[in-house]
């Protein structure tokens, strides 16, 4: 044995900066889902907006009912809650919110679409959350 101690090689992993809205939205929704901070579906989202419990809302641009879009947009503007329009399919929003079953290989199947999702608890702070909140009130992703 030698008298010289070997220095620990601490590897610091740097996080990539978030530059697109879709990735940031995915990370924020998944983080909120892990910390049980999501409201999914039109009824829960409207309740959380009216009680001003929602911190941010996501609305699928491909929503089948135009009245839903108008209602959520108006309520978010009235209560000053940031609203992000997600141009992806509502099944993508549902997948990000955890509305699916896993098959034997661990792949998502039976994905249920979600027209709207509200975040009431972000969980832990992240660069993605800061990036989204620094954007305008109504952003198209």
UniProtKB/Swiss-Prot annotation:
Alphabetized GO MF terms: structural constituent of ribosome
InterPro entries xref list: Ribosomal_eL30-like_sf, Ribosomal_eL8/eL30/eS12/Gad45, Ribosomal_eS12, Ribosomal_eS12_CS
Cellular compartments annotated: Cytoplasm
UniProt keywords, alphabetically: Cytoplasm, Ribonucleoprotein, Ribosomal protein
Subunit note: Component of the small ribosomal subunit. Mature ribosomes consist of a small (40S) and a large (60S) subunit. The 40S subunit contains about 32 different proteins and 1 molecule of RNA (18S). The 60S subunit contains about 42 different proteins and 3 molecules of RNA (28S, 5.8S and 5S).
Family of this protein: Belongs to the eukaryotic ribosomal protein eS12 family.
Protein name: Small ribosomal subunit protein eS12
Organism ancestry: Eukaryota, Sar, Alveolata, Apicomplexa, Aconoidasida
